[in-house]
Amino acid sequence: MAARLCCQLDPARDVLCLRPVGAESRGRPFSGPLGTLSSPSPSAVSTDHGAHLSLRGLPVCAFSSAGPCALRFTSARRMETTVNAHQFLPKVLHKRTLGLSVMSTTDLEAYFKDCLFKDWEESGEEIRLMIFVLGGCRHKLVCAPAPCNFFTSA
C-alpha cells in the first residue's frame, strides 16, 4: 500500500524531505531513516508542491496536490546520504525497478542525469539540488523520452 507524500525542499540541508499528506498525518512527525521530521502546518505548505519546477522525467503524480504515489525520493549533492549510500544503491534499485539491468553506481548516475536532469543542467540548477528517484510508479512520465520506462510498474 502506497502512502501519499509531498516533497519539500529543505534549503538549509540541501535535501528533499518527504512529508505525509492527509488528515490523519497532520501534526504528526514523519519518522524515517534520516530521523524524525515534523509535519508542516497547512499554511506552510506550498499548494503547487513543486509544479513550478521544470522537472522533465518525473511522473504526473509528482505534481499532484495529493503528492507523489509509490515514489521514494532521496537527494544529496553526491548521493552520500545514509539512505542511498554507494554500496547499497545498485541493490536497492535492482529490487525496486523494472526495465533496468544491474548497473554500477557510475552508470546509474549517468542514467539519472540523462533521463531526469537535462532541464536542470541547462538552467544551471543541478549543483544546487540533485534528486534521485528510488522506486516506481504507474503514472506516465512528464515529457519523458520514449525509451525511458523507469517508472513503469507491474
Curated annotation (Swiss-Prot):
Posttranslational mods: A fraction may be phosphorylated in insect cells and HepG2 cells, a human hepatoblastoma cell line. Phosphorylated in vitro by host protein kinase C or mitogen-activated protein kinase. N-acetylated in insect cells.
GO BP terms, alphabetized: DNA-templated transcription; symbiont-mediated activation of host NF-kappaB cascade; symbiont-mediated arrest of host cell cycle during G2/M transition; viral genome replication
Pfam families the record matches: X
Domain of life where this protein originates: Viruses
UniProt keywords, alphabetically: Activation of host NF-kappa-B by virus, Activator, Apoptosis, Host cytoplasm, Host G2/M cell cycle arrest by virus, Host mitochondrion, Host nucleus, Host-virus interaction, Modulation of host cell cycle by virus, Transcription, Transcription regulation
InterPro entries to which the protein is assigned, alphabetical: Transactivation_prot_X
Keyword Ubl conjugation: no
Cellular component annotations (GO), alphabetically ordered: host cell mitochondrion; host cell nucleus
Region (Mitochondrial targeting sequence): 68-117
Places the protein is found: Host cytoplasm; Host nucleus; Host mitochondrion
Subunit and interaction comment: May form homodimer. May interact with host CEBPA, CFLAR, CREB1, DDB1, E4F1, HBXIP, HSPD1/HSP60, NFKBIA, POLR2E and SMAD4. Interacts with host SMC5-SMC6 complex and induces its degradation. Interacts with host TRPC4AP; leading to prevent ubiquitination of TRPC4AP. Interacts with host PLSCR1; this interaction promotes ubiquitination and degradation of HBx and impairs HBx-mediated cell proliferation.
Xref: HAMAP family: HBV_X
Family per record: Belongs to the orthohepadnavirus protein X family.
Role according to the record: Multifunctional protein that plays a role in silencing host antiviral defenses and promoting viral transcription. Does not seem to be essential for HBV infection. May be directly involved in development of cirrhosis and liver cancer (hepatocellular carcinoma). Most of cytosolic activities involve modulation of cytosolic calcium. The effect on apoptosis is controversial depending on the cell types in which the studies have been conducted. May induce apoptosis by localizing in mitochondria and causing loss of mitochondrial membrane potential.
Protein's name according to its UniProt entry: Protein X
Organism listed in the record: Hepatitis B virus genotype D (isolate France/alpha1/1989)
Lineage: Viruses, Riboviria, Pararnavirae, Artverviricota, Revtraviricetes
Gene name per UniProt: X
